[in-house]
A protein has these predicted regions:
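A glycine/threonine-rich phosphate-anchoring loop and its flanking beta-alpha core
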Residues: 11, 21, 111-194
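FAD-binding core of FAD-dependent oxidoreductases
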Residues: 92-104, 138-141
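Short beta-strand/turn micro-motifs composed of small residues
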Residues: 37, 95, 152
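Glycine- (often His-adjacent) and acidic-residue-rich active-site loop
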Residues: 56, 68, 108-117
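ATP/NTP phosphate-donor binding region
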Residues: 1-90
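Short Gly/Thr/Asp-enriched flexible loops that form oxyanion-binding sites at enzyme active sites
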Residues: 50, 80, 99-112, 145-146
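Conserved functional loop/turn residues at catalytic and ligand-binding sites
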Residues: 58, 87, 95-98, 136
Length: 195
């Protein structure tokens, strides 16, 4: 049993009920973020508090929701196009692991160019992402604080990672108010994933 270790964490963690209200302060003045989420969260009304807070702070934003569980390359390329079209300069990943991973990979393509397939594996991302803030609404993935994102190959069903310290979010907002309404089954499975 080793009693010594090093631990480095570059993500600023904001925690507590209602902490979503601190989102504008984590973004640069005048930022224009792309919010990456999924249709289920839009339907559940969980995107509304985020857009309202940004709007109240006078920030313009764009929303991208073409995200599926076990995301594929088209989810990333579509998001990168949305980021460019809306002239965004920051990214917010809102949801479970899939939206947060897609947000990371959109940032990779937006700053490094090409296709996400070019960055599968470790150490292939050369340029840092735009400011990325992740807001998890489930309990299990940990994507909001890690240097990993996972892309699924639909032909083989194999999941390939993008691994780089450059994709670690600058901040994570852990607001229990956003996860309290999770369906019991989803809360249970993602909670067990965390354990």
């Amino acid at each position: 049993f080793q009693s010594h270790f090093d631990f480095r964490m570059s993500t600023h963690i904001v925690h507590g009920a209602g902490s979503i209200s601190r989102l504008p302060g984590l973004l640069a003045a005048g930022a224009r973020p792309l919010i990456v989420s999924d249709p289920g969260l839009v339907e559940a009304g969980l995107v509304d508090p985020v857009t309202a807070i940004l709007g109240d702070a006078g920030l313009k934003w764009a929303l991208y929701t073409d995200v599926v569980g076990n995301p594929v390359a088209r989810n990333v390329s579509g998001g990168a196009r949305a980021y460019e079209k809306a002239k965004c300069d920051a990214i917010i990943g809102l949801g479970g692991g899939s939206p947060m991973d897609v947000a990371k990979m959109i940032g990779v393509v937006a700053t490094n160019g090409g296709r996400i397939d070019n960055y599968l594996g470790s150490g292939k991302v050369k340029k840092s992402l735009p400011p990325l803030i992740c807001i998890p609404t489930t309990y299990g993935t940990g994507s909001e604080v890690t240097p990993f994102a996972v892309l699924t190959n639909p032909k083989t069903a194999i999941k390939d990672p993008v691994i780089s310290s450059k994709i670690t979010p600058i901040a994570a907002i852990l607001d229990p108010d956003l996860s309290i309404a999770l369906p019991m089954a989803l809360g249970g499975t993602t909670g067990m994933d965390a354990l």
